[in-house]
Each structure stands twice: as C-alpha cells, then as structure tokens.
Amino acid sequence: SSAASDVYKRQPPVSGHSLMRTKFDEIGMHMEEKMGHPFFCCDAVLDTYSRQIALYSGYAKVMQPESWKIADIRTYVPWAEKKYDIMLFGMPQAFHYGDGMGTNPIQMMQALSAQVIRHKRVMKDNCVIICSSICNGYFHDERWPYLRELYEMFQHDYMNILPDMNRYGEYFATNQEYIRKYRFCNAFHPFHGFSMMSCGHIAEMNTAAIYIVGAQEPGIARGMGLKTRATFEEAIEDAKRKFTGPNPNILALPQTFKLGAVHLCMKEEGRQGV
C-alpha cells in the first residue's frame, strides 16, 4: 500500500535491528556452539572524543544489550526542529579505514553513505549533499589493491548502479594475488570492496544529488555518479535552481570525520525506532 511505502521511506537505511546486525549475532553464537564454550567479551562505550564512558564484560548475549543502552543515549541525539534540504561537510584524505579513504572513489561513496545513515532522520527525502574532497586520484593501491579494478569495471559493461557489480563478488573474493596481499601485505580482503559498494549505494538511494567540490581530478567523482563544482557557493546555487528551491534549510557539519559521530534525530521524535 502507499501508506506502507511512505512508512518505509521514512525509515533510516540501517538500524541496530537489521538483518545484517542479527546475522552478526548468529555468526558469533554459531562459533560458540562449535567451540563448546562462549566468548568472554569486553565492550567499551566511547564518547565523541573516544574516551571510555562505560565498560561491560561477560557473555555477549547478556552484556551487549546493556552496553547498547548507554551507547544509544550517546549516539542518537534528539536535536532538529526542522528537516534540512542540504547537508554540507568536508572529507579529509585520511580517516576511518586509512589514508585514501577520502580520495579512493569507492571508499568515498561509503563515507558519503555513512553521513546519510547518521542524519537521514533530519533530512528531507529529496535532500542534497555537498562535500569537499581533494579527490586527487590517490587510490592507495597497497591498502585496497582491488579497488582500482572494481572502479574500472564499474565504468563499463552495463554497470549502471553499484549493485550491478554484485555478481563479481566471488570472482574477487577468490583472487589469489589479492588474498596474498591481504595475508602478507596488510591489505584489506578483496571482498571488503563489495561491503563498501553495498553501503555506498545508500547515498544514491536517499539523495536527490551529491556534489563534490574542490576536486583535483573531478572525473573520478563523476565516474561514481557525483556532480562536481569548484566551490561550495557554486554547488549551493546549482542545488537551489534544480532541487531545493531558493530558500533551503542547510545543515553544516564542520567537524565531520574529525570526531566520533552522532546520529541526529528530530527533537519531537526522540530516540523512537533506533
């Protein structure tokens, strides 16, 4: 029904109750069953500056729900009094998964989607992201030796959206040279790229447009379906003409990727559904 569809559209793209999250739990419990004893786990809740604010130890099935109660209070912030049309932030070259996170095009898409995941609750359905990135062509091939090949494949052979790449997952996951680099050269496992693309598609699904500003190699960004402009001002004016109208509500997040992130929520909704 259309009502059910509307509810689905309002839901955040990921949650602590998703199939992926429950599968993580099932995998751990299956390992415990085969080992014949449970894991002893220590779970620390960190604040915005990565300081420990709570520490729980014990059997994961019992301990983790208690840990998440505190983590949810720190993470989900009921704040917004209105929905926003445009989200502004910057993307450094080195963060999260390592140097090149903000310049490798597939890793860039994962980072853009992470912002959608965090702040979808306070953004309009046709929202626009404007993000600065040096986008200089640095793939960091030593860390992600498979991503240049994935990116090139995405440019050809009817690859219109990132999920079209899914059929190559096993092909990359069994590539012996990539596996050797994972085992001996500190590279990521080749299937990690498919995890990144799975997340990376969330940004396209939940935005009207994404602009990268200040790119040295803008063609790399355009190859991922992103729009490119020289400055924030140019991107905002273009977004106003094409997507948001003349008076957009703008959410500027200057500390993005510098501090431990929160998930912004509507003030009146509190932490419902997190």
Q: What are these model-derived regions, one by one?
A:
Residues 1, 31-35, 77-81, 121-123, ...:
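Solvent-exposed alpha-helices and their adjacent loops that cap or buttress functional pockets
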Residues 10-98:
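Membrane-embedded hairpin module used as a gating/binding unit in multi-pass transport
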Residues 61-78, 111-119, 185-204, 230-242:
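A short, acidic, amphipathic alpha-helical segment used as a generic capping/interface helix at domain edges
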Residues 85-90, 130, 251-252:
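Structural motif
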Residues 106-210:
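C-terminal catalytic subdomain
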Residues 198-274:
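Extended hydrophobic packing segments that form well-structured cores
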